[in-house]
Regions:
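Phosphate-binding glycine-rich loop
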Residues: 56-104, 118-122, 128-130, 195
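Short beta-strand-to-turn element immediately C-terminal to the catalytic PLP-Schiff-base lysine
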Residues: 211-212, 226-231, 271
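PLP-dependent aminotransferase class I/II
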Residues: 35, 64-70, 74-80, 141, ...
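PLP-dependent aminotransferase-like
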Residues: 95-191
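Aromatic (phenylalanine/tyrosine) cluster motif
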Residues: 10-20
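Conserved active-site segment immediately N-terminal to the catalytic lysine
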Residues: 182-220, 249-254
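N-terminal "arm"/small-domain region of PLP-dependent enzymes with the aminotransferase-like
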Residues: 18, 25-57, 62, 378
Length: 403
């Protein structure tokens, strides 16, 4: 059955809110709606799961091999190593590069903690850099200032669905002989356009790309999952070994590894959803366009920008609130049963886990400015126009009441 009508990407209206005496039926608004996304592809997913159950090949079965192959073809990259989750993907990537305790790894502070958590876990030294106030991705000038003789790797994060400035990052990495690991957990399917017109998928430009298939992601499993990818066969083979107890052959362990596998059921589900990823991303882009148009006349809202070098797949629709009490804004929406989230309320350099490094005078002005004012609105593939109208009117009513 066709999920969306032929005139647009929004699904048909569902079941309520009252507006000018009219009742509009509406589903409960959620930040993420994995249930209805599943229901839209239920037959395909159920059959894929049943196929795995019928073969009983639960670990590294055909579904895993098929998904790895299909993901590689989609991304345009040679080697894909599936693993248990996105955090493992980052950890395995760093382990494969033979980084040593005390080596410095540069990451943005304004991101989810997993990016930096694995750096500390491996006894490497995290070096926090600032982000661009428009894209929320790694700031190039801040990156340049952070490089020292101890720097060994850069981990740019394609935050919220927008690509980091990879061309400049790769140039800097080449100049200083540094590794680049792309954290692509929030931007799978996004395109990056180089100055010469070359287009590549995010996650495929550095030495290694890492992603997460957490259920809320643009390409989400029905549990945990992740993957690492590279065009370097030596690195790919080593990452595959590390992900499987460091084994080169069964019971022969060449390197210290871990146990990090994507199971066949999750791979089978992801294989179904991978074929729909571009459609899912277009649905998110349509939601974002609706929001941006609705908020165009509100000076206190800074809507997400899209750079000329990057598409945006809107894992999150994150706004900045200028001169506004964010807690009052959130409470106003909550009273209307409109959820919103703060990604992220505490940046990496201020987390308690890095308390010993907080004596360092980090020059992260943009990060410090963004943290108190960002707010993310609901965005997912199953939103309909009734919900979007209700959300945007709810946001607008907050600013109308202030006037």
């Amino acid at each position: 059955m066709q999920r969306w009508d032929t005139k647009g990407v929004f699904p048909p209206f569902w079941p309520f809110y009252c507006n000018f005496g009219k009742i509009h039926w509406m589903r409960k608004i959620q930040m993420v709606d994995t249930k209805n996304q599943y229901l839209a592809i239920k037959e395909e997913v159920d059959q894929a799961i049943q196929n795995v159950l019928d073969t009983a090949a639960y670990i590294n079965g055909k579904a895993v091999q098929d998904f790895s192959k299909n993901l590689g073809e989609y991304l345009g990259i040679e080697y894909v190593v599936p693993c248990a989750n996105g955090t493992d993907a980052l950890q395995i990537a760093m382990m494969a590069l033979d980084l040593q305790p005390g080596d410095e790894v540069i990451t943005p502070s304004f991101t989810y903690i997993a990016t930096t958590e694995v750096v500390a876990l491996l006894k490497l030294t995290p070096v926090f850099v600032d982000v661009d106030p428009v894209t929320y991705c790694m700031d190039i000038e801040s990156l340049k200032k952070a490089i020292t003789p101890k720097t060994k790797a850069i981990v740019p994060v394609h935050l919220y669905g927008h690509a980091a400035p990879m061309e400049a990052i790769l140039d800097i990495a080449k100049q200083h002989n540094l590794y680049v690991i792309e954290d692509n957990a929030q931007a799978i399917g996004a395109d990056y356009t180089f100055s010469d017109g070359t287009v590549k998928k995010t996650g495929t430009m550095g030495h290694i790309g890492a992603t997460s298939f957490y259920p809320s992601k643009n390409l989400g499993a029905f549990g945990d999952g992740g993957a690492i990818f590279s065009n370097d066969k030596v690195l790919a083979d080593k990452m595959a070994m590390i992900a499987n107890h460091g084994q080169s052959a069964r019971y022969y362990h060449d390197v210290v590894g871990c146990n990090s596998r994507l199971d066949s059921i999750q791979a089978a589900i992801l294989n179904i959803k991978l074929a729909k990823l571009d459609t899912y991303n277009k649905a998110r882009q349509a939601v974002a366009a609706y929001y941006t148009q609705a908020f165009a006349g509100i000076d206190a809202i800074v809507t997400p920008a899209i750079s000329n070098y990057s598409s945006h797949v809107f894992h999150q629709y994150t706004i900045q609130l200028k001169g506004v009490d964010r807690e009052k804004f959130i409470a106003h929406l909550a009273a209307k049963e409109i959820p919103c989230m703060i990604y992220y309320p505490v940046p990496g350099h201020l987390q308690k886990m890095f308390a010993s490094k907080q004596q360092h005078q980090w020059d992260l002005k943009v990060t410090d400015q963004l943290t108190p004012c960002v707010c993310s609105l609901p965005i997912h593939t199953e939103m309909d126009e009734v919900q979007l109208k209700y959300i945007t009117e709810g946001v607008q009513s907050f600013f109308n009441s202030k006037g």
